[in-house]
A protein has these predicted regions:
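Acidic/histidine-rich helix-loop elements
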Residues: 15, 41-47, 85, 126, ...
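Serine-esterase "nucleophile elbow" of acetyl-processing enzymes
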Residues: 1-46, 56-64
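Short N-terminal helix/helix-N-cap motif within the alpha/beta-hydrolase-1
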Residues: 14-15, 51, 80
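Residue-level detector of flexible, active-site-proximal loop/helix-junction positions
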Residues: 10, 47-49, 116, 160
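Alpha-helical cap/lid subdomain in secreted, periplasmic
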Residues: 55-199
């Protein structure tokens, strides 16, 4: 089976080894359960906004369809102060594209919420309350769009905020999640995927 992961630095697993990224951990968990999965195909780059992911997707050739697709994008829209309306439109376009790539089965698409980098050391000296509020605004949009199109939704944001008091959830760069935090995400995704496979 094939799994496509779309996103940004959080999907790549910035600052952790590739096999500790959440898409690779998802596949490892499912393989341990006896499901045959190819290595995940990751289309993501550090710093990407929704428009940059869209632009890249229109320029590359992918498989006709995938058994599962995940989508986690938006932190760089927030960081670069891009308008919410722009995010709404582009995220919905990305989700529709994700559903098409999942053989038009929205139940095979998993939207992951944006983690809150406002709790990380990287945010020191910034208005962390404002960052958290803006992340919540972006997540309200991606959740409502996911539900509208009947895709799965996983809210990892509350867990990401535990990094405020648990630095084991952060990578050495003081910004991105650690392998431990990605493992928590991977468990949630693997549960959703296994539920689909069991039908």
């Amino acid at each position: 089976m094939n799994y496509l992961a779309l996103g940004d630095s959080y999907t790549i697993g910035e600052s952790v080894p590739l096999h500790d990224s959440f898409p690779y951990q998802v596949v490892q968990l499912l393989r341990k359960k006896g499901y045959e999965f190819s290595p995940p195909e990751i289309i993501a780059k550090t710093g990407w906004t929704t428009d940059e992911l869209l632009s890249h997707l229109s320029a590359i050739k992918l498989l006709p369809s995938y058994q599962f697709v995940s989508l986690l994008i938006g932190v760089n829209n927030q960081y670069r102060k891009k308008p919410l309306d722009e995010y709404r439109q582009q995220f919905e376009t990305l989700l529709k594209k994700s559903i098409r790539l999942a053989a038009n089965q929205s139940s095979k698409v998993i939207v992951v919420s944006i983690p809150d980098w406002g709790v990380t050391p990287y945010a020191a000296g910034r208005d962390v309350k404002k960052i958290s509020e803006e992340i919540d605004d972006f997540n309200l949009l991606n959740k409502s769009i996911a539900l509208l199109h009947q895709a799965n939704y996983i809210d990892i944001t509350p867990g990401s905020r535990e990094a405020l008091t648990n630095k084991n959830l952060l990578a050495n760069d003081g910004l991105h999640p650690s392998a431990l935090e990605y493992a928590r995400w991977a468990n949630l995704l693997a549960q959703k995927i296994e539920a689909q496979l069991k039908g």
